[in-house]
A protein has these predicted regions:
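Transmembrane beta-strands of outer-membrane beta-barrel pores
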Residues: 141, 170-174, 196, 205-209, ...
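Feature captures outer-membrane beta-barrel proteins of Gram-negative bacteria and organelles
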Residues: 155-157, 184-195, 218-231, 370-384, ...
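Post-signal-peptide, soluble extracytosolic/periplasmic N-terminal scaffold domains
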Residues: 2, 6-12, 19-271, 580-653, ...
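Short, acidic Ser/Thr/Gly-rich low-complexity loop/linker segments typical of extracellular
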Residues: 688-696, 773-785
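Short, ordered, surface-exposed loop/turn motifs in non-cytosolic proteins
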Residues: 49-72, 678-688, 758-772
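A short, amphipathic beta-strand motif
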Residues: 57, 277-279, 672-676, 748-756
């Protein structure tokens, strides 16, 4: 393939297009017939023929835009052509305003629409091999110089699309005595994209069949809204029924609009906080995180400690966590999500404005209630290390609230913020009530000791303070005595000791009320990795958890485990769990992780309670497929019950280019549709996605407003499939569905020497084109050597070889082709 690579290199040209004609020295080619070389297209240095091209745009060493239309236009009075750099191209580059205003039109182009960007410091390069246009621009010209930051001019809103994300769970409980019961849960998001606008509707469905012919079902839409990015304002506009997400005020459901700064449009260094939720499951259990009845996250976990992934930064307030065990028992508690101090850069302002009417009466009630309200909040970087923030809720009714705070970066001492909020409310029957709420946040990372401490969201509210949700609740109960929050705080601490291969984590959360018992949660975990003789990579951990519930009662749990590697990506573990209710569980577990796409485990244990003891057996399997993720688990306690759980997570996306099922997507993060024509089985991003029978596949496009590199897994391509490009780079806005057509061919491949009727070879650079489809199958190299791909049965008799601008002969291929045969003799007549 050396000659083929040489032929490709010969096609490289540059966009400094005004040059003298050059005749190539054909003697440099290792060819037996030097006169038999057709290089007329390359006779002028840097030559690119005038016309319209579809090229990938690059800036320095970074991709900017893919498959962008580019014009190459002739210059009047000169035997030359130039690449037309338009104002739209310049806008994509993120140049400083003074540089843009200084650009002049290219002389000799009549319409004046082509700008001269070439100078002693900048270049415009064209690569025919890669179909790429590269701008070499000095950093001093650039408005943005953060290597992890892509300016808004390079963001894409994607294509018009419909989507449906879903999470389906089903479980069956079969007691030894009593009726079998089934439960089902389905939740997700449906949406539609048009330009920069996104329509979204969250949905939830649940059903419980008791086994006695009775069933309960429920379906509702917690929020339906329309949103779009406003890059010029670094903001997001939302319209419809949604939840207020505020760093200052408590969250509540309302119908209206919100205009807010979006941190994700800022550099990565300015990112907020998202809570971690942890606990201990007694069996194969279903964990649900919700807020005001809306499911935020739901999954099934194995017995033992669990930690859920970070939730969205846009979530604020208290979260409800419930664990439903395989025997049907349920435990619930609350987690506070107050954010750590956020420091704005000096002179920077971040804001949020919301207006509308509250929705109250549960997630099923989409009727608004008074009063109409207007909310505003802002953070201002007053000084280098000091930020001021505040907010106001003004209503046409009987509720007003105002807050004022300060955030301070104390350097080595960490970051601290403090604020005070006042509320004024007139309750039913004319009772007026005013009160104050005080809050302190603190966070500190100790780099030298590997420690992180966050004293997150300590808040104290006096007896007369009412948040907006509490006020709405009082109105709904005609001034009745609803739960009235008094104090809440969350403390998290983590410690890493690399020398000892140990780590520790502590989490404390407390929420109490003026008129109810407190809700407290404590979690401590210790982990160590060690060796024992010839056994390497052993690990041991111990966890302590205590939950005190608002309705009374508490549960203490201790969990300890030791894991021993068992071959490659397999392990055996022993665990023991004890609680304050007399329960003691001992379990031996075997886990298999050698296939990253399908993992499974089985376990056997003995359970002892105050009322007796029993044995238990359980197992689970999780499989990640290109079109979704599946999981199943089963539990057996002889003489007690059997249970079975199933789950399926996935998405379906449809555009004018096709539709495809895919793995579950995260919230409103963007996704990318890959189109390979009719070529199926093309793997993308490992096993994240594979094109379906129609040549369409969908994969996650990473994070909004961040460049995502999506690659075709060339090593895993089917033997008869070839692709022209394997990496896709694009920056998509929130919720966007990107689209990229990949030139893929499916068919036979052959390597051979093409011979004419007189025994000679076609000239170097001649093209082999399918007479059936018009697709280029390959290019002729030295001595007639050609590598032809994507050949169909019809191509065996319809491949044309062209040079000098016309078809010269037609190839005749053997009936059976295989690349392993080596170079074949390919007659051309």
């Amino acid at each position: 393939m050396k000659i083929t690579r040489l032929a490709i290199l010969m096609t490289l040209t540059f966009s400094v297009l005004k040059s003298q004609a050059t005749e190539f020295n054909a003697s440099l080619l290792d060819s037996g017939n030097l006169s038999n070389v057709d290089l007329t297209a390359f006779s002028r240095e840097g030559y690119v023929a005038p016309g319209n091209y579809i090229l990938d745009i690059w800036l320095n060493d970074q991709p900017v835009r893919e498959q962008y239309p580019v014009r190459v236009v002739p210059v009047a009075g000169l035997d030359a052509a130039v690449i037309c750099v338009t104002t739209d191209m310049v806008a994509m580059l993120g140049l400083k305003d003074k540089i843009i205003h200084g650009l002049k039109p290219v002389t000799g182009i009549p319409d004046g629409q082509c700008l001269e960007l070439r100078s002693a410091d900048s270049q415009v390069r064209y690569s025919a091999e890669n179909q790429r246009l590269t701008f070499i621009i000095p950093q001093a010209w650039m408005r943005y110089q953060d290597p992890d930051w892509v300016p808004p001019s390079r963001w894409s809103d994607g294509v018009t699309a419909g989507l449906l994300d879903y999470s389906l769970m089903a479980s069956r409980y079969m007691p030894q005595q009593g009726e079998t019961s089934d439960s089902y849960s389905l939740y997700g998001t449906a949406g539609f994209n048009l330009g920069a606008w996104r329509l979204r509707s969250d949905y939830q469905y649940s059903r419980f069949d008791s086994g006695r012919g009775a069933s309960q079902s429920d379906f509702y839409l917690p929020q339906t809204y329309l949103f779009r990015a406003l890059p010029a304002l670094r903001s997001k506009l939302t319209l419809g029924q949604t939840y207020l997400s505020s760093a200052i005020f408590d969250s509540f459901r309302f119908a209206g609009l919100t205009l807010a700064s979006d941190e994700r449009m800022l550099p990565p260094s300015l990112q907020g906080y998202a809570p971690k939720i942890s606990g201990i499951a007694n069996s194969n259990a279903q964990v649900t995180v919700s807020q005001n009845g809306r499911i935020l996250y739901q999954t099934r976990v194995s017995p033992g400690p669990f930690e859920l992934p970070d939730l969205s930064q846009n979530i604020s307030g208290n979260l409800d966590v419930s664990v439903r065990e395989s025997d049907g028992s349920v435990r619930t508690w609350q987690v506070n999500t107050a954010s750590v101090p956020f420091m704005a850069r000096q002179g920077q302002v971040r804001y949020k404005v919301a207006a509308g009417r509250p929705l109250y009466g549960g997630t099923h009630n989409n009727s608004t209630v008074s009063p109409d309200f207007l909310l505003g909040e802002a953070t201002w970087g007053a000084f280098n290390n000091t930020s001021l923030y505040g907010g106001l809720i003004a209503s046409t009714g009987d509720y007003q609230s105002a807050a004022l705070g300060i955030g301070q970066n104390m350097g080595l001492l960490g970051a601290l913020s403090a604020d005070v909020t006042r509320s004024d409310a007139r309750l039913p029957h004319g009772q007026k009530q005013s009160g104050y709420s005080y809050r302190i946040n603190y966070a500190k990372t100790f780099d030298k000791t590997g420690s992180t401490l966050a004293f997150v969201g300590y808040r104290f509210s006096d007896r007369h303070f009412l948040s907006m949700p509490e006020y709405l609740q009082r109105r709904a109960t005609d001034g009745g005595d609803a739960w009235h929050e008094k104090q809440s705080y969350t403390v998290t601490y983590s410690q890493s000791v690399p020398v000892l291969n140990m780590s520790a984590a502590l989490s404390i959360s407390r929420l109490n009320y003026w008129n109810a018992q407190s809700n407290n949660n404590y979690m401590l975990s210790l982990n160590k990795v060690f060796s024992l003789g010839d056994l390497q990579g052993l690990s041991a951990s111990v966890s302590f958890a205590r939950n005190q519930y608002t309705g009374g009662g508490s549960q203490n749990q201790v969990y300890a485990t030791i894991s021993i590697p068992w071959g490659d990506s397999r392990q055996v573990s022993y665990s023991v769990q004890k609680d304050n209710r007399g329960g003691l569980q001992q379990t031996v577990n075997y886990s298999d992780f050698h296939n990253p796409d399908t993992t499974w485990n089985i376990s056997a244990g003995h359970n002892r309670y105050d009322t007796g003891s029993n044995s238990s057996f359980s197992g689970s399997v999780q499989s990640r497929l290109p079109w979704g993720q599946a999981a199943a688990d089963a539990t057996l306690q002889p003489g007690q019950y059997r249970s079975l759980g199933l789950s399926w997570y996935g998405s379906v996306t449809a555009t004018a280019h096709g539709a495809a099922f895919s793995q579950s997507m995260a919230g409103n993060e963007p996704r990318m549709m890959i189109d390979t024509g009719d070529v199926a089985g093309v793997p993308v991003n490992g096993n994240s996605g594979v094109t379906n029978r129609f040549g369409v596949g969908v994969v996650s496009a990473g994070s909004s407003y961040r460049r995502s590199d999506i690659s075709v897994d060339v090593a895993a391509l089917p033997e008869d499939v070839d692709v022209s490009s394997s990496v896709i780079s694009q920056v998509l806005t929130e919720g966007a569905v990107g689209y990229r057509k990949i030139d893929a061919s499916q068919g036979e491949q052959v390597l051979g020497h093409i011979r004419l009727a007189d025994g000679a070879s076609p000239p170097f650079g001649a093209m082999v084109v399918s007479g059936t489809t018009g697709r280029t199958a390959g290019m002729v190299g030295d001595d007639g050597l050609a590598y032809l791909t994507g050949l169909s049965k019809e191509d065996h008799r319809t491949l044309n070889v062209s040079w000098d601008g016309r078809v010269q002969c037609r190839l005749s291929l053997p009936e059976i082709l295989t690349i392993s045969q080596g170079p074949l003799l390919l007659p051309c007549k």
